[in-house]
Amino acid sequence: KIVSTTFVNMEAVVEAVKNSTSEITIFTSGTTGQPKKVVHCVQTLMRAVRFGEKYINQVWAYAYNPTHMAGLQVFFQAFMNLNFLVNVFNKSRTEVYSLIETNRVTHMSATPTFYRLLLPFEKVYQTVQRVTLGGEKSDKKLYESIGMIFPNAKINNVYASTEAGTLFAAKGDSFQIPAAIRDKFLIQEEELLIHKSLLGQSDSFKFDGDYYHSGDLIEWVNEANGLFRFRSRKNELINVGGYKVNPGETEKVILEIEGVQQALVYGKANSILGNVLCAEVQ
């Protein structure tokens, strides 16, 4: 049922969204098969939104598809604080830098691939105060490059999935499970399992008891404090002669070579070993 409502100002709209019981349907990326429909209530999507006076003058570069989980979460962070959004999605490197400078962007959230596509750079951008990375594994070399482009920015990572939304914030190169929901996670054979109470609704979910297999492999930094690092996606491991090879770790080593800006490691079928590793380097 659609209800027509008139609001006296934007503050009233924000308040209505805060109290909304509406649901939003989004789809998984489909990188591991057919895209799956997931339904989230607005409150779940705003789980990580921060409110307050310190956030009201932010200017966000909008680098995600607005129909995806990450795009929705950046939208709500900006919208709920009445921030200005600058569309840099699918823009060229030159256009992105021009928009950052012209609009005096203060905050950015994007994938590591997006930031790598900003390289090389010709000048620095002093207005950017925070840079967030998510959706893919990052590396030290990229952090260093981002730090040079945006010298006044704090850099952090975020973990979010279409199935669950934002769950963890970064502490350095690690993530921390909040104490309040630490009992909602299990680790089985290095894979992160998420309790169904933290997920959206989908007919495609398959549970192991009350838990959902995220497909993310992790390693503990400090188990007692809920600190961990992501290693890779479970389905990304490549079988080479009976050994499970992590392409992300191989890419990390290649990226440490001077002059290398991007690296993509993948498996290619081989009649003797099953697969051999291949790398494309820029």
PLM regions: where:
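Conserved AMP-binding A3 loop
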Residues: 23-50
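Short beta-strand->loop structural element characteristic of the AMP-binding/adenylate-forming
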Residues: 1-8, 36-39, 83-91
